Amino acid sequence: MSNLISVAEYTDTLLKHYRIVTVLSERNESKVLRLRHKNLNRDLILRSLNTKVAAYDTLCKVKSENLPEIYDAKVLSDGQIVLEEFISGITVADVMKSGKYRYRGAKHVLSAVCNALSVLHQNGIVHRDVKPENIIISDEGRVVLTDFNISRRISTNTKDTVVMGTVGYASPEQLGVTATDTRTDIYAMGVLLNVMLTGKHPSETLARGKAGKIVKKCTAINPDDRYQSAQKLAEAL
């Protein structure tokens, strides 16, 4: 019998020192809260997950300007709790409500995300959900890739058995055809670039010129035909 406490018990203990500022999201599989320390007036993000995401163990040890700091990731009796840096800012999705990006602005954002992905991939993690809603532009202009709830450790031996990701951004291999790897994130980056420039999925409207060529290579059906690393994509940008 496990001696681990539950997610609810851990949260109750934490809330003796923090108060809930807002519920950022609530789904069947997860809940995300913004908390504020009652005495220190400092904010953090609390993620309650109903399954263990192994990638968070690695993320606790990873540092990058373009990734949020993960303070702790505790496996509990009925799930996992993640304590994460709160970043004040707006998402790329929020920015796009005011209009499309120009190439220079999109390049700045994607180059930063490429840096984040390079760090993840070097540590054996594939993000699997790169999209405008998961990229924050901080009040200071820092570009940060967030939300690792469906990230996985890279394995060449197992294919994805559960369809995960966001429709339109998910690569063919995320449908269970084969194992996801670093090139899965490259596919999503191509869709992201196209959406930022045109407001449309590349299957509807392809970006013009150099950007369109980059998008086509990123979103090739065969992963071998895509950029083989985030660094190679950054160089192409």
Model-predicted regions and their roles:
Residues 109-110:
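Activation segment signature within eukaryotic-like protein kinase domains
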Residues 77-91:
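Conserved short submotifs of the Hanks-type protein kinase catalytic core
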Residues 121-137:
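Catalytic-loop of the protein kinase fold
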Residues 226:
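Conserved HRD-motif arginine in the catalytic loop of eukaryotic-like protein kinases
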